[in-house]
Amino acid sequence: MANQEVRMMTRQTWSRFSARRLFRLPAWAGVVAVAFVLGAVVVPMAASAGPVNSSSRSDPPPGKPPLKHVFVIMMENTSYDDLLSSTNPNTTFIQQLAANNGLATNYFGVTHVSLPNYIAATSGQTWGSNSDDVLQAPLFDHQNLVDQLEAAGVSWKAYMENLPSPGDLVTATPDGLYVRKHNPFLMYPDVYQNTARAGNVVPLTQLSTDLATGKVPQFVWITPNICNDMHGGAPSCPFPSSPTDPLQAALYKDGDNFLRTWVGLITHSKAWTGHSAIFITWDEGGFEDQSPFGPTDIRPGPDSPILAATPANPTTGGGGDLAGGTVYGGGHVPMIVVARGVGHRVDPTFAGHYSLLQTIEQNFGLPLLGNAGDLVQVGNLSSLFR
């Protein structure tokens, strides 16, 4: 991978960024730094830590059998260049993953801020949202991935780090580590109003048990806490004041260590077979990607809405987002696909969160929702693991 310089923000841009978007967490204990190679995967040895109205049904691309287990890990608010630059000493595991597994080099978030990216990845549209306000949940009363999985008899769970209990609708925990805006499943009324469905949204600690007992569902979504996903802002992971602030480096390390731990646990579990894959991506790029720096910030197709700033909402009480201007897509972020025995592959095709959804749906033979059904402008990620 060619060396890339870490993009530096202007003082003005950083001040806006630091007020809203970064964080850090204490280093994890118990992580063994020695990495082993399992197939193509560079992983550590770690201790166990409604109705269907969509496009026609899809089939997996030809080649290998469908994936038995699909894992999605959604990280936060960090750009492709910042993560994969060889000048960043704090994301070494992420760089190893990218160098030894599937890498989509032109993968983009859908928009800013966080929540509509999560909604896009699980329903195929943002439904007009560009806000993190959880009180807008009724807006998302639409068909979603959970509806599809259950209609097809595909087992699923969403594992949320620091979620107090299964299905808990708390907006944020007192320590600030769990935030509902990073949990799309409890933003859909037909999930959070259904006790059985909401019970499948569980604390991340449950995944250790499920991996150890071999009771891992076919579809797994993992959301780290607000420090470990590189977002930050909790008391234990304050916002950095500048790009060179040690708090910024700590955020990188926290996310890198989180992935080192959980990729290791997954790939050393009974669920890790030749028909399993882990999709690792970031919801959106850094704050600098919200400005029209050039074509690298904007991808073609339905993944690139240009939205006006959102004012404060007097109806819901939600604060305004992106008060400084417009949004040019969600920014350039990595998409790393870890699949056993596949090796390093690179796909330069433009892709984004609708591509992730399309890939999941095609794997399980589900209809294609919303923009995931735009087969002209949205391509799947199968070249990275088949």
Regions found by a protein language model. Give the residues of each.
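Generic hydrophobic-segment detector
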Residues: 25, 29-30, 45, 114, ...
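N-terminal secretory signal peptides that target proteins for export/translocation
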Residues: 1-23
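Bacterial N-terminal signal peptides
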Residues: 28-41
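Terminal low-complexity, poorly structured segments
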Residues: 18-21, 34, 365
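Cleavable N-terminal signal peptides
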Residues: 35-36, 46-49
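N-terminal pro-sequences and low-complexity stem/linker regions of secreted or lumenal proteins
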Residues: 49-386
